[in-house]
A protein has these predicted regions:
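A conserved ligand/cofactor-binding region detector
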Residues: 1-107, 117, 122-136, 140
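N-terminal alpha-helical segment
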Residues: 111-114
Length: 140
């Protein structure tokens, strides 16, 4: 892991994302993917955050860490064309980042099947995935 780049992202993230829980989630996604706990990661910058993001700088820092990123704008509803979030998908290769994007599209559209591969891709422990599959997605 390139410590300089992750330190810079860690110092920068709270200047963009004001919600502390979201900062922690973003950093956990990035670090988890970097150290191999997760194969892929996904998170987003909301409208009030994305205007503060230098996406070229962010991409460069992720690349310095050995991560590839795919960005995508997703509308948040309503008639305002500026009401969108900037999603990002991470992986050790561009193909993995694109796979993450595809998996999340399937999940959001309801076109996916519960299976171990999605859980593994997202970095969940086998026991958690098995429990989820056993309960058929009901987490009560």
């Amino acid at each position: 892991m390139e410590k300089c780049a992750i330190s810079e992202i860690d110092a920068w993230m709270p200047t963009v994302v004001k919600d502390k829980a979201s900062v922690v989630r973003n950093m956990a996604e990035i670090v988890g993917t970097d150290i191999g706990v997760k194969t892929v990661a996904m998170d987003c910058f909301l409208p009030e955050e994305r205007e503060k993001v230098d996406f070229v700088w962010f991409r460069r820092k992720l690349h310095e860490m050995g991560l590839h990123v795919v960005f995508e704008r997703r509308a948040l509803g309503g008639s305002d064309p500026w009401n969108f979030a900037e999603y990002y998908y991470l992986g050790k290769t561009r193909d993995i980042a694109l796979t993450a994007q595809s998996v999340f599209h399937k999940i959001w559209s309801g076109e996916w099947e519960m299976n171990r591969e999605i859980g593994k891709l997202l970095g969940y422990p086998t026991t958690a995935v098995d429990y989820f599959l056993k309960k058929k997605g009901e987490m009560s």
